[in-house]
Amino acid sequence: MTNSVAKLALLGFCILQVTSLLVPQANARAFLVFGDSLVDNGNNDFLATTARADNYPYGIDFPTHRPTGRFSNGLNIPDLISEHLGQESPMPYLSPMLKKDKLLRGANFASAGIGILNDTGIQFLNIIRITKQLEYFEQYKVRVSGLVGEEEMNRLVNGALVLITLGGNDFVNNYYLVPFSARSRQFSLPDYVVFVISEYRKVLRKMYDLGARRVLVTGTGPMGCVPAELAQRSRNGECATELQRAASLFNPQLIQMITDLNNEVGSSAFIAANTQQMHMDFISDPQAYGFVTSKVACCGQGPYNGIGLCTPLSNLCPNRDLFAFWDPFHPSEKASRIIAQQILNGSPEYMHPMNLSTILTVDSMT
């Protein structure tokens, strides 16, 4: 009898130990990422799509020096935020390696090519549109519940830091994709912006209804200033006027929508990151940030290295830290570090109603 009791006690202890390994530590915080190629860290590698970053020289400055599916020479913004949190960057949701304790650290649902609208990026075929990313979020919650129970899952999701980056493709790869696009015939630009913002509000509200309580929402960058647009639309290196107009309409309305949404839910659940201004700082004065250029991409071909894809046959700069743009559309790791630093410590001009460092301090007190 005594031997049986001892065995039961040992079994109970083992179960307790295994369970404690699965339950996140009190100071750990899940990190959930949604959006497009600016934050995708490899989901599209698992899909039959042309929107991929799985070839050299992508990843040339990543710790492994190999392509990872990130549209960067090295780390991207989710990686840099994770670095600040002292955690591993969340894995792509489609990765078969995302399970058990890795699942409890969060997940990256982002997919290159998508937009707020489901008809954005149709030329890329098989991508994870934002509606599907939210379905995966619901699936993620079920998987986490299976590991730690529903109560602990709700605590994890409510306490998670969420990052969402959307909007640029709705202009570059939809409204302005071709002359007389379907959306440009349906809407004037101001009306299109209002429509896109209204659809984005539905996405963010759905995210809140699914349990997200700390959501960093980044705006678009200065879309007319990326090398791809300079190559197609610029005569003398000036930013493309129409896309800059789109950014100047979209971003202030996004901030106002987030303010209204916070008032609706009665908390500062949503944080607006003014990434347009963050980019313009180093685009307008690249030398002040240690760049030799903010017009020419490090990797590419044609004018401004802005034509086509970054491939093994492309022009490649020897020092990526001297270039604000890595490829025709995406910032270099160094530029991403500047943006991440503003997300962390930026003034109200950049982060509204507060920056990430303040969020982390406030949340640590609750």
UniProtKB/Swiss-Prot annotation:
User: Any idea which UniProt keywords this protein has?
Assistant: Glycoprotein, Hydrolase, Lipid degradation, Lipid metabolism, Secreted, Signal
Which Pfam families does the entry mention? Lipase_GDSL
Molecular function as annotated in GO: hydrolase activity, acting on ester bonds
Check the UniProt entry and state the signal peptide residues, or none.
Answer: 1-28
- Provide the E.C. number(s) assigned to this enzyme: 3.1.1.-
Active site as annotated? 37, 327, 330
Cellular location of this protein? Secreted
Provide the GO biological process annotations: cuticle development; lipid catabolic process
Gene3D superfamilies xref list:
SGNH hydrolase
Q: Which domain of life is it from?
A: Eukaryota
Carbohydrate-modified residues are 118, 355
Q: What is its main location?
A: secreted
According to the UniProt record, one GO cellular component term is: extracellular region
Question: What family does this chain come from, according to its entry?
Answer: Belongs to the 'GDSL' lipolytic enzyme family.
Instruction: From the Swiss-Prot or TrEMBL record, give the protein name.
Output: GDSL esterase/lipase At5g33370
Q: What is the lineage of its organism?
A: Eukaryota, Viridiplantae, Streptophyta, Embryophyta, Tracheophyta
